[in-house]
């Protein structure tokens, strides 16, 4: 990106002066997202340092945090998806969706859950720094999983397997969820693994307003990361405005 950015600037703006640099920044802000703008500004600034014109360095643009959650699966779609999967006899995927929505697991964590963890009722995870995080499996989910496993005559090993009997991959889960979204007429933009983690957090705060506990359950280093779940989705904001603003 560094060479491409500098080459583009030289081709289109030629001289490195205040006027041209601000014109270039304006162009970036009009056509690109803030993160991309900042990456290109960073490249230009490095070149300015290199040619001894560091006084002309451009300032980065401020990335505004959105005031709403994006692409979060609704409770209605979550319930509908589970219902359809169960109805069609796709029990493993019924449980994949249920576990994602009821444990707050990241997909990389979900694929590591073993039958032994189901029987225990939790799965202990350790971060790179050795910090412990416990992923709890709710009682109802645990009991239903045990019934399913009994029918499948499985007593040990990874909970979710692929068609070869090996541990399923995170990529495999993402792709299959997209396939089911298409099959059942759901928006594939919201039917992806992390969307269910967002749903878990939102539902948790609505039933138990303990943000510190949720931060621990989610494995967030900072409670500020968890605060985003206090926000509503864009759809919820629109619905609320439609009800409130009648003047």
Task: Report each predicted region and the residues it spans.
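Conserved catalytic core of the tyrosine transesterase superfamily
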Residues: 1-247
């Amino acid at each position: 990106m560094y060479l491409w950015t500098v080459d583009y600037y030289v081709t289109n703006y030629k001289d490195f002066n205040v006027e041209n640099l601000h014109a270039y920044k304006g162009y970036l802000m009009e056509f690109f997202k803030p993160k991309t703008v900042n990456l290109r500004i960073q490249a230009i600034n490095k070149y300015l340092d290199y040619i001894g014109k560091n006084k002309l360095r451009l300032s980065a643009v401020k990335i505004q945090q959105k005031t709403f959650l994006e692409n979060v699966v609704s409770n209605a779609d979550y319930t509908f998806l589970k219902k359809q999967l169960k109805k069609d006899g796709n029990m493993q995927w019924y449980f994949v969706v249920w576990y994602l929505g009821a444990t707050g697991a990241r997909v990389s964590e979900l694929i590591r859950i073993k039958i032994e963890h189901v029987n225990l009722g939790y799965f202990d995870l350790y971060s790179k720094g050795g910090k412990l995080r416990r992923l709890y499996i709710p009682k109802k989910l645990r009991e239903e999983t045990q019934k399913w496993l009994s029918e499948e005559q499985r007593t040990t090993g990874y909970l979710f397997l692929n068609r070869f009997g090996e541990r399923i991959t995170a990529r495999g889960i993402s792709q299959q969820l997209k396939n089911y979204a298409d099959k059942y007429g759901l928006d594939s933009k919201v039917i992806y693994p992390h969307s269910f983690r967002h749903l878990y957090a939102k539902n948790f705060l609505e039933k138990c307003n303990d943000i510190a506990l949720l931060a621990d359950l989610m494995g967030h280093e900072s409670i500020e990361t968890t605060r985003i779940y206090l926000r509503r989705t864009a759809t919820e904001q629109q619905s609320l405005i439609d009800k409130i603003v009648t003047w």
